[in-house]
Amino acid sequence: MKKLIILGSTGSIGRQTLDVVRSLKEEFEIVGLTGYNNVSLLSKQIKEFRPKVVAVKDEEKARKLRENLDEPIEVLTGKEGLKEIVKYEADMVVVAVEGIAGLIPTVEAIKLGKNIALANKEVLVTAGEIVMGLVKEKKIEFLPVDSEHSAILQCLKGNNKREVSNLILTASGGPFRGKKKKDLVNVTVEEALKHPNWKMGKKITIDSATLMNKGFEVIEARWLFDMPLDKIKVVIHPQSIIHSMVEYVDGSVIAQLSVPDMRIAIQYALNYPDRKYVEGVKFLDFYALGQLTFEEPDFETFKCLSLAYHAAECGGTMTAVLNAADEVAVSLFLQNKINFLEIAEIIEEALENHKNIQNPTLDDIISVDLETRERIMRKYLR
């Protein structure tokens, strides 16, 4: 039985990971779970999966959690709790916690030699060089949970990486595919949250609407697969059936296809290199599929994608600024404090005003993250 710790078990990916575990209960044992605010859902998860230890946001949430439980359990709190929980004996840590909060526990888990299933974008976007350096040093398995990166991993398997011509990440184009800037000035939060194919959390859904999500995935792919940026392409594929492709030097393209269901990518990371069927996952019906279509991304309208490429080319702490500025800008948009197009404007301004630090330490990255957030919030929440 493989022992798992799931960071962020009450979020979208965390819940789907537990779906996979529920379907494959003979394969996995849950050692630890963490939830931020959702004490009631975490209580239910504890009763079902019976972990040894859990972690929550603060002491107040810990008290509420203990009140909800019949049996005593070790409850850790705060940022220290996230660092502490990965020290428990486990074969794999699933990093499904949102935001920069996922960085330190991931680094701690790698240092302890634990395999990682990564569903957090910020870890590689902000600190890819440091993290992948540790992965190589510790010789652990570091497996992507993102459907696009999982697809690339599968398309590379059994092939010579030196023969890769391009990694091709697919993007649905989000709810505003085909629109121009003038059409996007007055879009509402509700419209931006209507993703055509995937059910996800609010932050990642807005990032999909701006194409920043794809920009983050380009940066992640660079570090995960040790590939130069000019060999990582993005193509709009509205049906979200092809999850990504690898083009080889002979002109062959290998693609991974499936229905849009995150549990397929999750099970692959948890069972790697094996595959297991997860109850409820549908198979593709090629007769009913109809057309698969492809378009070039509109870098002018969806400027976040080009900002991500720019930050990645600059390196250093620029990607930490990109990430922090995006997180604050999306939060402001969700609160109706700014319009949709201002998300990219805020990020661009933050990048222009930043004095880049090359070869940053983790402390540099965390302090740049904090400074960027504070600067933007001071300006927009006066």
From Swiss-Prot:
Sites where the protein binds 1-deoxy-D-xylulose 5-phosphate: K121, S147, E148, S172, H195, S208, N213, K214, E217
Keyword Glycosyltransferase: no
EC category name: oxidoreductase
One Pfam family of this chain: DXPR_C
SUPFAM superfamilies xref list: 1-deoxy-D-xylulose-5-phosphate reductoisomerase, C-terminal domain, Glyceraldehyde-3-phosphate dehydrogenase-like, C-terminal domain, NAD(P)-binding Rossmann-fold domains
Keyword annotations: Isoprene biosynthesis, Manganese, Metal-binding, NADP, Oxidoreductase
Superkingdom assignment: Bacteria
GO terms for MF: 1-deoxy-D-xylulose-5-phosphate reductoisomerase activity; manganese ion binding; NADPH binding
Keyword Metal-binding: yes
Pathway: Isoprenoid biosynthesis; isopentenyl diphosphate biosynthesis via DXP pathway; isopentenyl diphosphate from 1-deoxy-D-xylulose 5-phosphate: step 1/6
Residues annotated for Mn(2+) binding in this entry: D146, E148, E217
Cofactor(s) needed for function: Mg(2+); Mn(2+)
InterPro entries the UniProt entry points to: DXP_reductoisomerase (IPR003821), DXP_reductoisomerase_C (IPR013644), DXP_reductoisomerase_N (IPR013512), DXPR_C (IPR026877), DXPR_C_sf (IPR036169), NAD(P)-bd_dom_sf (IPR036291)
Enzyme Commission number, as recorded: 1.1.1.267
The protein's role, per its UniProt record: Catalyzes the NADPH-dependent rearrangement and reduction of 1-deoxy-D-xylulose-5-phosphate (DXP) to 2-C-methyl-D-erythritol 4-phosphate (MEP).
Family of the protein in this entry: Belongs to the DXR family.
Matches recorded under PANTHER family: 1-DEOXY-D-XYLULOSE 5-PHOSPHATE REDUCTOISOMERASE, 1-DEOXY-D-XYLULOSE 5-PHOSPHATE REDUCTOISOMERASE, CHLOROPLASTIC
Descriptive protein name: 1-deoxy-D-xylulose 5-phosphate reductoisomerase
